[in-house]
Amino acid sequence: GNQIQFTQKIDSISLAIGRIPARTIAEANKMVEKLIQYQSNKKMGLWQNQLTWVADDADYNLHLQDAEEIIANLKTKTANWNHKKLYLDLFKASQTLTGNTYPDVNKAIQEAVQSGTLVLNYTGHGNYLRLTEEAVISKSEMQSWDNAGKLPIMVTASCDFAPYDQPGSAPIGFDALMQNDKGIIALVAANRLVFAYSNKQIND
């Protein structure tokens, strides 16, 4: 495909394009079955009006500000969403020998996912092994999610969280996609190095 650099506001795309990142026929069948179950899901509820926002710390509050601007823009279009803000800068960091951690953020994300959220949106630094330097979302975190029937769409305005064309990698986002009846139902993510400005343009 072609690379597109977003430098100004554009209309929404006319056609949604995605892929099932299956490496085997068994994985493809598993994902198709998961999509069918999601479409026929009977667990209707308030969770389908819930949007959860996670924003990285540091960088002069850039990621927090980006999330706030996107939420403000959404509110001008509809007031039907409930916004849960899990910004790292709103929580107290714990200092360890290996650096800072945010255990309360890890816990809050876990609770938000398990109680149900339509979208889990992250803005900040990351890679295919974790989101944030403090790993508020990691493989072990995502594997522990027990959210059957309440699968979120995950959006990560971050670096290479989903390098689908690198066979040697094991992206945690794909792992969450492939989990049976838990994890996530869809993922919007980059597969290469990206920058905050373009991330925000797409996320918005």
Where are these regions (language model features)?
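Cysteine-dependent hydrolase recognition
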Residues: 1-204
